[in-house]
């Protein structure tokens, strides 16, 4: 072990530590960070070399954060990244600084948004919040309105989690939906992600995702938002149902198949006649 440590440069150690952090299960960032900190035994090296991993983890996980003075949480995503550690809260039209290690928001300030698309963004946000409230009791959503490659684009992100460390499991749902505002019809693109970690009497992770493509009729803001939510609801319900059905199938078939019903000989042993078997005689003579 000592020889291995001598062979690893600081750069390699940080690279390995960063991978552990980025792949930390939902709700277990602090535990993984503390373990990596002990292994690396160099706080300055960890903070400076793995800072990008802290940020990437929060962006990938859609980490929700509460801003002092505002009621609702906002998600940390690449779509709200303003650079230099600042992020956008599109609903409240503010920017704020975010500490990726402490997961704290500070210094909220007014921030200009794209007025040309704000009415569309607001309509989708209103419909999306109602949907999330109905389907994800602990869920958070953030809706962005941005011009991308000259096209007015709506991006809706959803995050919902259950952290049950006392019961040895944690899980998180994430989904991202996007469409451009164009005459008549447009394409909706979505990606759904589930990640669950169970670690009582074992160590099992479920990591699953699904890409969605659908068409959306574009009319006025309110009606378009309503039709958009119908697509979201149908796709997410179908995905969650499929996950549940697959687990039931695995329970009924796959997991049972892991345990051999019969010995390799394909015949059951008659324990009452064990002495007549060769192995029984060998045991008797032992």
UniProtKB/Swiss-Prot annotation:
Spans traversing the lipid bilayer: none
Domain of life: Eukaryota
Cysteines engaged in disulfide bonds, as pairs: none
Record-given protein name: F-actin-capping protein subunit alpha-2
Organism: Gallus gallus
Function: F-actin-capping proteins bind in a Ca(2+)-independent manner to the fast growing ends of actin filaments (barbed end) thereby blocking the exchange of subunits at these ends. Unlike other capping proteins (such as gelsolin and severin), these proteins do not sever actin filaments. CapZ may mediate the attachment of the barbed ends of actin filaments to the Z-line.
Family as reported in the entry's similarity comment: Belongs to the F-actin-capping protein alpha subunit family.
UniProt key word Cytoplasm: yes
SUPFAM superfamilies recorded: Subunits of heterodimeric actin filament capping protein Capz
Subunit structure: Component of the F-actin capping complex, composed of a heterodimer of an alpha and a beta subunit. Component of the WASH complex.
Cell compartment(s), UniProt: Cytoplasm, Myofibril, Sarcomere, Z line
Any single GO BP term: actin cytoskeleton organization
GO molecular function: actin filament binding
Pfam families assigned: F-actin_cap_A (PF01267)
Keywords: Actin capping, Actin-binding, Cytoplasm
Expressed in which tissues: Present in all tissues examined.
An example Gene Ontology CC term for this record: Z disc
